[in-house]
């Protein structure tokens, strides 16, 4: 397979998990409920804002009249929803699990303060060397793009 001439990488729209993390970063940890922290990462859905974002980028791509040879998406619900909401004509999406983002392990289910207090060394490493930092009990896969469109 030859290398693409152009590679478009599109991140999923805002997800329910993004809302929880953003609220926590602003000091509101009320969304870190037992129901929320037990949702598997792959199952988070888009919010209404996320669907609007996906629709917006989809309309823009269609307006560019760009045709793609391949359309790839991770198996996560939010990425598949983004792909579907973009409504790209003639797109046949291929699920590819290599495109999934890395797991954040147990850190995904705790607040920022809990992370700082319970894993101080790991917190410091994350802040001094974020490119090579890996969460405790997380996958070793690097961060990959969620949705990919290529042209040749």
For the regions a protein language model found, what residue spans apply to each?
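General small-molecule cofactor/ligand-binding pocket signal
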Residues: 8, 72, 94-96
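Cytochrome P450 catalytic-core helices
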Residues: 78
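An N-terminal RHG(E/S)-centered segment typical of histidine phosphatases
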Residues: 1-69, 81-84
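Phosphate-handling substructures
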Residues: 16, 20-41, 45, 87-150
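Short beta-strand scaffold positions
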Residues: 73-74, 146
């Amino acid at each position: 397979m030859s290398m693409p001439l152009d590679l478009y990488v599109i991140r999923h729209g805002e997800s329910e998990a993004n809302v929880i993390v953003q609220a926590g970063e602003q000091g509101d940890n009320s969304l870190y409920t037992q129901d929320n922290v037990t949702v598997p990462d792959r199952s988070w859905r888009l919010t209404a804002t996320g669907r609007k974002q996906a629709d917006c980028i989809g309309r823009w791509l269609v307006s560019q009249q760009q045709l793609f040879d391949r359309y790839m998406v991770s198996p996560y619900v939010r990425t598949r929803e983004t792909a579907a909401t973009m409504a790209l004509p003639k797109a046949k999406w291929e699920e590819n699990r290599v495109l999934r983002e890395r797991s954040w392990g147990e850190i995904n289910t705790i607040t920022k303060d809990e992370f700082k207090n319970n894993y101080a060394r790991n917190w410091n490493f994350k802040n001094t060397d974020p490119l090579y930092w890996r969460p405790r009990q997380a996958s070793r896969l690097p961060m990959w793009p969620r949705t990919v469109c290529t042209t040749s």
